[in-house]
């Protein structure tokens, strides 16, 4: 039986109260624990972070820097403790910046690859980022494409990922990136398939992605940004006052892709990000996320490797 360690992250990348900062609590309240009843589940004391700030920080130039730095440190510690103890960490809530804690911490214990499932490539350079949100930049920081002028403890752990240790499924942000003259990782040698390709053959491409990752490391981490979904399928993504990128995967396509990926073996943990309970008053989206978790965990082999 897989032993699961839940890691709820009460962080909002814009420093807001509510929104993504309460996503973990909303998912717990919508039956996340019950969905994992077939597993041995542990969860440590609730994570406590500094009060959110909407100012850019002096070390990273990113918004909500004090909470970001504390969060990445805590997430990294909890994830590595879980993996070392033979448990499967499920990091839930917050945004994609949790990867700035997870990947460097895992890297310290040996090679690790990343399957990144997201509607955006998240490689916005720090000097180009118009809003200073870490979750627009984290993949570029992990790869060392940006962040050379950062200071402090986070900068000391970066870069932490090679281009051949990354596979990306689902982006649909070409138009947005072009506004800032930011190229695609696909053009620089990263294994990537966009949302239309994934929608056509989700299982095949997910398996191919994992096979690519396992050429470079036996262990790989799964990260899912739920904005890979079509906003008509999942409205509680993005910012309340900003139009979401149209199109994206259906729940069925995402489930099929993730199920095929984890069934391939080698997945040592999973982060699930970008859910805004403030845009989900009846919690129907939260309940759908919980169903996704249950479906994917069922496909996980009894041993991670």
Regions found by a protein language model. Name each.
Residues 116-119, 143, 165-173, 194-196, ...:
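Short, structured patches in soluble enzyme cores that scaffold and shape functional sites
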Residues 2-90, 102, 184-305:
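Catalytic cores of soluble, metal-dependent hydrolases
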Residues 124, 175-177, 278-279:
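Active-site environment of divalent metal-dependent phosphoester hydrolases
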Residues 84-156, 161-165, 264-265:
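Active-site histidine-anchored catalytic micro-motif
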Residues 150, 170-177, 249-254:
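A general structural motif
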Residues 163-165, 173-175, 216-220:
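Aromatic-lined glycan-binding groove of carbohydrate-active enzymes
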Residues 7, 94, 117-119, 169, ...:
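Active-site flanking residues adjacent to catalytic metal/cofactor-binding acidic residues
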Residues 175-186:
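Short, glycine/polar-rich helix-capping loops at beta-to-alpha or helix-loop-helix junctions
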